């Protein structure tokens, strides 16, 4: 299996159906590349990334599982985030939440 690979039946399949998404402009203000994985709580990513962190609370990148987005130094790009599902509790990462959202 390949990271992010989906093995499905015939027909159309919508991922993250019914989940709220937002777009944010993100700038890497640091001097090193920053890579963010598919399921990382975006609110808690590397502090060198500049964006509206409050808006990103409870969201992750809306990309295939097992993949990542790389932000080069000085790069600005728009990303789509999708709302976290399940119990909507966040533990670990940078320890900024450590409980229910």
Curated annotation (Swiss-Prot):
Keyword Hydrolase included in the entry's annotation: yes
Organism superkingdom: Bacteria
CDD domains linked to this entry: Urease_beta
Localization terms from the record: Cytoplasm
EC primary class: hydrolase
The protein's Enzyme Commission number: 3.5.1.5
Gene Ontology terms, MF aspect: urease activity
Pathway it works in: Nitrogen metabolism; urea degradation; CO(2) and NH(3) from urea (urease route): step 1/1
Any one annotated GO CC term: urease complex
Catalytic activity: urea + 2 H2O + H(+) = hydrogencarbonate + 2 NH4(+)
Any one GO BP annotation for this protein: urea catabolic process
Keywords (A to Z) from UniProt: Cytoplasm, Hydrolase
Subunit-structure text: Heterotrimer of UreA (gamma), UreB (beta) and UreC (alpha) subunits. Three heterotrimers associate to form the active enzyme.
PANTHER family from the UniProt entry: UREASE (PTHR33569:SF1)
Family to which this protein belongs: Belongs to the urease beta subunit family.
Name used for this protein in its record: Urease subunit beta
Protein species of origin: Burkholderia thailandensis (strain ATCC 700388 / DSM 13276 / CCUG 48851 / CIP 106301 / E264)
């Amino acid at each position: 299996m390949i990271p992010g690979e989906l093995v499905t039946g015939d027909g159309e399949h919508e991922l993250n159906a019914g989940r709220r998404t937002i777009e944010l402009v993100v700038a890497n203000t640091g001097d090193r590349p920053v890579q963010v994985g598919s399921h990382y709580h975006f609110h808690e990513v590397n502090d060198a990334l500049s964006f509206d962190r409050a808006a990103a609370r409870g969201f992750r990148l809306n990309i295939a599982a097992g993949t990542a987005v790389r932000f080069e130094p000085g790069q600005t790009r728009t990303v789509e985030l999708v709302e976290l599902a399940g119990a909507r509790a966040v533990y670990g990462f940078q320890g900024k939440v450590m409980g229910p959202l």
